[in-house]
């Protein structure tokens, strides 16, 4: 595949991946994921820090996360959930999970200042937020001025395995000191949200006309 100098990211595509793909405009994002899982369950879906998750992993984890959002947090179709994190493996799982639950995803720049974060949360009316621990101190400074009812914290090593994940968490927090102190009473650990049975999910049929983001 020849690489267009105006599109340098193409050189990172796996061999055989076309520059352009045609998607059926009648299919939702969740439908596309379900089809990928059905056709290529063990294929790599996402890779980060040398760790990959398959389409099956993404599908199962996203359903469990969706079940938690519905059954434990009580979020309903049309509610907003903010997501403030970089490109880590938890992000696609959370995105698909929120959409399965019928929620609207509000993406938030993880580099936002407290003032910028407060504005976006208030403007969107988000009821919940999944936030990277490195940014949690920003939220703690303004959460009282927002409608946020539920805070879910994710760490860099959550999906990197027990050894690599624990090491990454330790280095980031204690050696590089990239996790400032914060106070968010009642915060939820992201990994604990993946314990619900998939059967608990009430996956309301979605439409291409539903607001996703």
Spans of model-derived segments:
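AMP-dependent adenylate-forming
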Residues: 7-11, 31-54, 212
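Flexible, non-catalytic linker and terminal segments flanking ANL/adenylate-forming cores
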Residues: 1-26
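ANL superfamily adenylate-forming
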Residues: 142-209
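Conserved ATP-dependent adenylate/AMP-binding module captured primarily in the ANL superfamily
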Residues: 112-145, 160
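Structural motif
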Residues: 82, 128-130, 152
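Conserved AMP-binding/adenylate-forming core of the ANL superfamily
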Residues: 25, 42-76, 82-88, 92-96, ...
């Amino acid at each position: 595949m020849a690489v267009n100098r105006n599109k340098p990211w193409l050189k990172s595509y796996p061999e055989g991946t076309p520059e352009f793909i045609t998607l059926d405009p009648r299919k939702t994002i969740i439908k596309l994921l379900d089809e990928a899982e059905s056709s290529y369950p063990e294929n790599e879906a996402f890779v980060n820090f040398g760790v990959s998750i398959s389409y099956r992993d993404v599908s199962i984890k996203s359903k469990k996360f969706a079940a938690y959002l519905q059954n434990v947090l009580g979020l309903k179709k049309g509610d907003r959930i903010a997501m403030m994190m970089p490109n880590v493996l938890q992000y696609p799982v959370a995105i698909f999970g929120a959409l399965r639950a019928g929620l609207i995803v509000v993406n938030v720049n993880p580099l936002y200042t407290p003032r910028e974060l407060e504005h976006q949360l208030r403007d969107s009316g988000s009821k919940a937020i999944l936030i990277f621990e490195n940014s949690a101190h920003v939220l703690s400074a303004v959460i009282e001025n927002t409608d946020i009812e539920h805070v879910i914290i994710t760490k860099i090593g959550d999906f990197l395995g027990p050894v690599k994940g624990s090491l990454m968490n330790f280095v980031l927090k204690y050696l590089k000191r990239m996790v400032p102190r914060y106070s968010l009473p009642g915060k939820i650990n992201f990994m604990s949200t993946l314990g619900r049975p998939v059967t608990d999910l009430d996956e309301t049929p979605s439409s291409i006309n539903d607001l996703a983001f």
